[in-house]
Amino acid sequence: MTDSQQSKPKHVMMMAAGTGGHVFPALAVAKQLQQQGCQVSWLATPIGMENRLLKDQNIPIYQIDIQGVRGNGVIRKLAAPFKILKATFSAMRYMKQLKVDAVAGFGGYVAGPGGLAARLLGIPVLIHEQNAVAGFTNAQLSRVAKVVCEAFPNTFPASEKVVTTGNPVRREITDILSPKWRYDEREQAGKPLNILIVGGSLGAKALNERLPPALKQLQVPLNIFHQCGQQQVEATQALYADAPANLTVQVLPFIEDMAKAYSEADLIICRAGALTVTEVATAGVAAVFVPLPIAVDDHQTANAKFLADVGAAKICQQSTMTPEVLNQLFTTLMNRQLLTEMAVKARQHAQPNATQHVVGLIQKM
């Protein structure tokens, strides 16, 4: 390496688009790269949520016009190669103009043309797959990437370039106190079990409709915090209207401080998106995962199995969420010692240093 190369800050182009599941881990890595003196730019789509999320992050955005090519429609399939080619050339133009040294792809439509562009220009590519089942774009890019990061073990075939890093998570989640201390403190104080239900920003109708009747059948004292989405507050509250005296219920449209919610929960009931599973493990909380049944390649079930297989969580498929099944499941779980053991196992399988790990791999390219 020449003196001029050593003095020039490394320029890393991030590629992540479409959903928070792709964008948030990439942003965590980008911010740490900036803290280490790297130049960071972002390859985005014109209409993706990444544009809004990056608005005040001091990261320049470069857009390429690309949409999903997976799906039906003859015209769409015929046009796809031309759209990919055009987007690839646009990405190449940006990379040459910016003198990009390394590219880090975190998924979304933008990563395909961006990864191909980097490969054609001889720029090293790192990809990061958040789910336990690789998405279409990352599965293709794994063949040409220099480094392949997986959040969950065995997502990709074993190889020298495959590294299990975990998913980058926010600092406030990694700073949560140990589950053993939290659960023991609540037990010694004689507090009721805290049940946290999280349906995501829009809420999960199946959770909102099926969980209240089942929870009302339980005989033990419970504090229930049910995040149901803005549009489903009244309907969810109505289902708890005749709750017995042993239940204290709060129905919330959204939760602003998830770190606090995790730290206070004895049991969380939620979907099994990659970042949710990662945060549950990092926080150290016993969980019941209800995988989204329409998730591509059923990847949420695969995500949930990461913790279920080590005794840190239970999986309840939405199709089996009958009152009888839920009652049996919850009756078993209303045991603080069991929940403590599950939470400790969850924390044992977390990778709280994922952000630093990925950043280190990028710096070495």
UniProtKB/Swiss-Prot annotation:
Keywords: Cell cycle, Cell division, Cell inner membrane, Cell membrane, Cell shape, Cell wall biogenesis/degradation, Glycosyltransferase, Membrane, Peptidoglycan synthesis, Transferase. Its EC number is 2.4.1.227. Gene3D superfamilies: Glycogen Phosphorylase B. The keyword Phosphoprotein does not apply. Pfam families: Glyco_tran_28_C, Glyco_transf_28. GO terms for biological process: carbohydrate metabolic process; cell division; cell wall organization; lipid glycosylation; peptidoglycan biosynthetic process; regulation of cell shape. UDP-N-acetyl-alpha-D-glucosamine binds at residues 19-21, 131, 170, 201, 255, 274-279, 300. Signal peptide: none annotated. It is found in: Cell inner membrane. InterPro entries: GlcNAc_MurG, Glyco_trans_28_C, GlycoTrans_28_N. It is a peripheral membrane protein. Pathway: Cell wall biogenesis; peptidoglycan biosynthesis. One of its GO terms (molecular function) is undecaprenyldiphospho-muramoylpentapeptide beta-N-acetylglucosaminyltransferase activity. It catalyses: di-trans,octa-cis-undecaprenyl diphospho-N-acetyl-alpha-D-muramoyl-L-alanyl-D-glutamyl-meso-2,6-diaminopimeloyl-D-alanyl-D-alanine + UDP-N-acetyl-alpha-D-glucosamine = di-trans,octa-cis-undecaprenyl diphospho-[N-acetyl-alpha-D-glucosaminyl-(1->4)]-N-acetyl-alpha-D-muramoyl-L-alanyl-D-glutamyl-meso-2,6-diaminopimeloyl-D-alanyl-D-alanine + UDP + H(+). GO terms for cellular component: plasma membrane. Transmembrane segments: none annotated. Belongs to the glycosyltransferase 28 family. MurG subfamily. NCBIfam families: murG (TIGR01133). Cell wall formation. Catalyzes the transfer of a GlcNAc subunit on undecaprenyl-pyrophosphoryl-MurNAc-pentapeptide (lipid intermediate I) to form undecaprenyl-pyrophosphoryl-MurNAc-(pentapeptide)GlcNAc (lipid intermediate II). HAMAP family: MurG. This is UDP-N-acetylglucosamine--N-acetylmuramyl-(pentapeptide) pyrophosphoryl-undecaprenol N-acetylglucosamine transferase. The lineage of its organism: Bacteria, Pseudomonadati, Pseudomonadota, Gammaproteobacteria, Moraxellales.
